[in-house]
């Protein structure tokens, strides 16, 4: 019995093994066992069905779908299937663990980046707050500076008002000084212009008329008048009162005449203070035979007559001043040298008397392009007696030149006669003027620490030192060079 039982168990086990559905090694999830059991069930059911052939025909996979069944070598036991499933699950577990670790590392990296970004953001916020605070402080400072600027502007505006007043006063004083210097230049240049022998009235006060003057040429009847040598009107006090001088003596030197002309051309306001000065210049009926004085007298009368014919006079304020008598005497001395040579050439003089005018007024004509009319200046009563005209038949024409060439020539003669000296009379003054500007440079060179390659000397100080050493010879050479043209001009005037 026992043997039969064991044999039946083995047969049943063999049948079970044979009837067990095939499990492939590739099927890790056991899907093949389910399909085999379903197939076996369907086969069992097919035995009871009335049409077993058709069911068997359609239940075979090879017949229906063309899929070959797996080989018996690939079939696994359930234990092997479990082991395969366990291995597969372990592999998946390892994969998930690896992925989890990767995710953890990524999370850590992101956390570190986030922390860094937070720190950077905090720093940026701190900088932004600091910038805002600095901006607020800067705005406060700007407001304060604006307030300071406004206060300074207000103070400057107040001061500018006072400065403008000062500038106006200074301009007024400058204008007065310009008129004074202009009149002094006229007084100095009058004598130099009168020494020229080639011009008819180049050095006379008629030159001081404006360039827009219509009367540039005057005839003898209009300017000087037709007077005979024996005409009593030549010695009348009414006609002689126009020049503003008193006739007292018959013997008058050329010096007095030139001094009178310089005073008239300089525009001196003849008042009570100058009465004694004017009374010293007396014009007589007889004058020495000098062409210089002849031109001077004719020019004076022509200038006065032109101003009367135009009937244009503007009363303006004039700055009173006292001319330097020393300069006038020096000019007169130079004129005497020229006049003494020409004294013997002319034996007769051409008088130029003027028409009747107001005896209490004299006209001062100033040189300049800006003035358009002469200025009348009140003077004391005086008379004038011109010389007797020995040649009354010839008309005398006075031409008032306005060309620039003659003015430049006259200016050149004055500059040649008056050389400028850039050195003083004392040697010590010139020495100090050369040496003193170099003292700060020398002191700086002595006290400062010189670098390598820096020159010891300064070019300006070196030049001043050379000039200091040769100052004596330089002064002598410059004086000689300035003295030569003056001597040459003096010699030319004597010739």
Swiss-Prot record:
<keyword id="KW-0175">Coiled coil</keyword>
<feature type="compositionally biased region" description="Polar residues">
    <location>
        <begin position="207"/>
        <end position="217"/>
    </location>
</feature>
<keyword id="KW-0812">Transmembrane</keyword>
<feature type="region of interest" description="Disordered">
    <location>
        <begin position="191"/>
        <end position="244"/>
    </location>
</feature>
<dbReference type="GO" id="GO:0045806">
    <property type="term" value="P:negative regulation of endocytosis"/>
</dbReference>
<feature type="modified residue" description="Phosphoserine">
    <location>
        <position position="200"/>
    </location>
</feature>
<comment type="subunit">
    <text>Binds to STX1A. Interacts with DNM1; this interaction inhibits the binding of DNM1 to AMPH and DNM1-receptor-mediated endocytosis.</text>
</comment>
<feature type="modified residue" description="Phosphoserine">
    <location>
        <position position="204"/>
    </location>
</feature>
<dbReference type="GO" id="GO:0043005">
    <property type="term" value="C:neuron projection"/>
</dbReference>
<feature type="transmembrane region" description="Helical">
    <location>
        <begin position="427"/>
        <end position="446"/>
    </location>
</feature>
<feature type="modified residue" description="Phosphothreonine">
    <location>
        <position position="214"/>
    </location>
</feature>
<protein>
    <recommendedName>
        <fullName>Syntaphilin</fullName>
    </recommendedName>
</protein>
<feature type="coiled-coil region">
    <location>
        <begin position="79"/>
        <end position="161"/>
    </location>
</feature>
<feature type="region of interest" description="Disordered">
    <location>
        <begin position="1"/>
        <end position="74"/>
    </location>
</feature>
<keyword id="KW-1133">Transmembrane helix</keyword>
<keyword id="KW-0771">Synaptosome</keyword>
<dbReference type="GO" id="GO:0006906">
    <property type="term" value="P:vesicle fusion"/>
</dbReference>
<dbReference type="GO" id="GO:0016020">
    <property type="term" value="C:membrane"/>
</dbReference>
<feature type="compositionally biased region" description="Low complexity">
    <location>
        <begin position="7"/>
        <end position="49"/>
    </location>
</feature>
<dbReference type="Pfam" id="PF15290">
    <property type="entry name" value="Syntaphilin"/>
</dbReference>
<dbReference type="GO" id="GO:0005881">
    <property type="term" value="C:cytoplasmic microtubule"/>
</dbReference>
<keyword id="KW-0472">Membrane</keyword>
<keyword id="KW-0597">Phosphoprotein</keyword>
<dbReference type="InterPro" id="IPR028197">
    <property type="entry name" value="Syntaphilin/Syntabulin"/>
</dbReference>
<feature type="modified residue" description="Phosphoserine">
    <location>
        <position position="219"/>
    </location>
</feature>
<dbReference type="GO" id="GO:0005739">
    <property type="term" value="C:mitochondrion"/>
</dbReference>
<dbReference type="GO" id="GO:0045202">
    <property type="term" value="C:synapse"/>
</dbReference>
<feature type="modified residue" description="Phosphothreonine">
    <location>
        <position position="235"/>
    </location>
</feature>
<keyword id="KW-0770">Synapse</keyword>
<comment type="function">
    <text>Inhibits SNARE complex formation by absorbing free STX1A.</text>
</comment>
């Amino acid at each position: 019995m026992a043997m039969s039982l064991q044999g039946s168990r083995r047969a049943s086990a063999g049948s079970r093994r044979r009837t067990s559905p095939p499990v492939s090694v590739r099927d890790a999830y056991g899907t093949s066992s389910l399909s085999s059991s379903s197939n076996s069930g369907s086969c069992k059911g097919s035995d009871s069905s009335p049409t077993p052939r058709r069911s068997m025909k359609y239940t075979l996979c090879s017949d229906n779908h063309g899929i070959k069944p797996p080989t018996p070598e690939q079939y696994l036991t359930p234990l092997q299937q479990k082991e395969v499933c366990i291995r597969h699950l372990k592999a998946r577990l390892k994969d998930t663990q690896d992925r989890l670790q990767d995710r953890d590392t990524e999370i850590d990296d992101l956390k570190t980046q986030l922390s860094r970004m937070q720190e950077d953001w905090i720093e940026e916020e701190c900088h932004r707050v600091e910038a805002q605070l600095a901006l607020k402080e800067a705005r406060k400072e700007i407001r304060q500076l604006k307030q300071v600027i406004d206060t300074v502007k207000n103070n400057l505006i107040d001061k500018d008002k006072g400065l403008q007043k000062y500038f106006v006063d200074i301009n007024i004083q400058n204008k007065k000084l310009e008129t004074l210097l202009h009149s002094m230049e006229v007084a100095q240049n009058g004598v130099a212009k009168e020494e020229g022998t080639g011009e008819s009235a180049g050095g006379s006060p008629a030159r001081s008329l404006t360039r827009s003057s219509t009367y540039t040429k005057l005839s003898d009847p209009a300017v000087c008048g037709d007077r005979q040598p024996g005409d009593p009107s030549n010695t009348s006090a009414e006609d002689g009162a126009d020049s503003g001088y008193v006739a007292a003596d018959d013997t008058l030197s050329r010096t007095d005449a030139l001094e009178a002309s310089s005073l008239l051309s300089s525009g001196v306001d003849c008042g009570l203070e100058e009465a004694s000065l004017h009374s010293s210049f007396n014009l007589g009926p007889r004058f020495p035979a000098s062409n210089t004085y002849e031109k001077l007298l004719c020019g004076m009368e022509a200038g006065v007559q032109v101003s009367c014919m135009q009937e244009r006079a503007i009363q303006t304020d004039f700055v009173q001043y006292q001319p330097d008598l020393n300069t006038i005497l020096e000019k007169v001395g130079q004129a005497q040298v020229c006049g003494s040579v020409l004294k013997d050439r002319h034996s007769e003089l051409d008088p130029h008397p003027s028409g009747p005018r107001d005896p209490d007024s004299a006209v001062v004509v100033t040189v300049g392009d800006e003035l358009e009319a002469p200025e009348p200046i009140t003077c004391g009563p005086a008379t004038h007696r011109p010389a007797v005209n020995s040649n009354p038949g010839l008309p005398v024409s006075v031409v008032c030149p306005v060309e620039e060439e003659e003015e430049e020539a006259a200016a050149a003669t004055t500059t040649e006669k008056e050389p400028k000296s850039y050195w003083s009379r004392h040697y010590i003054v010139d020495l100090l003027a050369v040496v003193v500007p170099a003292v700060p440079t020398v002191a700086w060179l002595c006290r400062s620490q010189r670098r390598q390659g820096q020159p010891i000397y300064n070019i300006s100080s070196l030049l001043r030192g050379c000039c200091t050493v040769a100052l004596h010879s330089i002064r002598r050479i410059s004086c000689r060079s300035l003295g030569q043209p003056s001597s040459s001009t003096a010699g030319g005037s004597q010739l």
